[in-house]
Amino acid sequence: MKQYLELVAHVIKHGTLQANRTGVNTISFPGAMLRYDLQEGFPAITTRRMAFKSAIGEMVGFLRGVSNAAEFRELGCKVWDQNANENAQWLNNPFRKGEDDLGEIYGVQWRKWPAYKRIDTGNVAAIELALGQGYRQIAESEEDGQSFVVLYKAIDQIRQCIDTIINDPGSRRILFHGWNCAQLDEMALPPCHLLYQLHPNPQTREISLTLYIRSNDLGLGTPFNLTEGAALLSLIGRLTGYTPRWFTYFIGDAHVYENHLDMLNEQMTREPYPMPKLVISDRVPEFAKTGVYQPEWLELIEPSDFSLEGYQHHPAMTAPMAV
C-alpha cells in the first residue's frame, strides 16, 4: 500500500489549508489517482489495522438499499451514527424522518433510483413504450395549455449493470452512481464515492472498476472506500463469471484533516506489509463454475461472507470523524 502513503505525503506537502463545512480545516489537493491490480492482492491498508468488517458491513448495507443507521449497526457498521444523529444541518432538515434516519443515501439511489417521465398525453407511442418499460402513471396535469401525464418507476442500477455484463459485456455504459440532484437535500450526506464504472473483458474474462470520488478524507475515508470498491468488484466478478483485475480510484478533492496529521505522520514511518487476499465464502455461487446467473445474491450476501487471508498489519490507530 505504498501508493496510499505516497498520496498522503503528496497532499500534506503540496496541498493548501482550507476551511470547510465541518469546522475542521483540511490540507487539500485537487485531483489524485490510485490504481491496484487485484491479482496482486487486496488493497487493505497495513500501516494500521483496517476496520474491515465495518467497511464490508457498509457495502452490504448499500447493496440492500439501507437508509437507516440502526440497520447499518446491525451489519457491524457504526460510521453512520454521527451523520444520522449529530449533524446539525440534517437534524434541522424537514426530510429527516427521525432518529437514525439517513434519507435517500447511496444504496437507495443504487437500487431504487426514482425515475420520472413527463409525456404529452397526445404522444401515445411514448406512453405505451414507458409503460412497457415498467413505468406506471401517477399523475395527469396541464401546463400552458398542454396536457401531460407523469409516470414513475424505481430503477435498480446495480442489477442493470450486472445484467449488462452478462448480456452485453462489450458495452461501455456499465455504470451506476448516487448523485441524484433532485434528492441531494433529502440526504444526511451527499455521496462522496459517487460514480462506479465496470469494465468486463470477454477475451480475458477479467473485470475492472473505475471509481470516481468527489471528496475523500485520506485518513479515514480512503481506506474504507478502497476496501468497499475492491470487495464489490470481486463480488460482481464472482456473480458474472469474471476475475477481478484493475481497480482505478480517482479523487476530486483529496484532503487530510488537521486532526488526522498525527495519525498519518506516524503511519508514514511504518513499513507496509504485503497485500492480503480477499476470500469470499463458498456459499456464494460462482458463475464461472456453475454457469447459473444468480443476481439475487446482491441481497443475500452477508458481511460474514468476506474475510482477509494473510492480513498483517501494524497496531490500530484512531482519529475523529468530521461531521
Swiss-Prot record:
Pfam families: Thymidylat_synt
Stored InterPro entries: Thymidate_synth/dCMP_Mease, Thymidate_synth/dCMP_Mease_dom, Thymidate_synth/dCMP_Mease_sf, Thymidylate_synthase
Main location: cytoplasm
Binding residues annotated for dUMP, in chain numbering: 21, 172-173, 214-217, 225, 255-257
Subcellular location: Cytoplasm
Catalysis: reaction(s): dUMP + (6R)-5,10-methylene-5,6,7,8-tetrahydrofolate = 7,8-dihydrofolate + dTMP
Family: Belongs to the thymidylate synthase family. Bacterial-type ThyA subfamily.
NCBIfam families: PRK13821.1, thym_sym
Subunit architecture: Homodimer.
HAMAP family: Thymidy_synth_bact (MF_00008)
Stated name of the protein: Thymidylate synthase
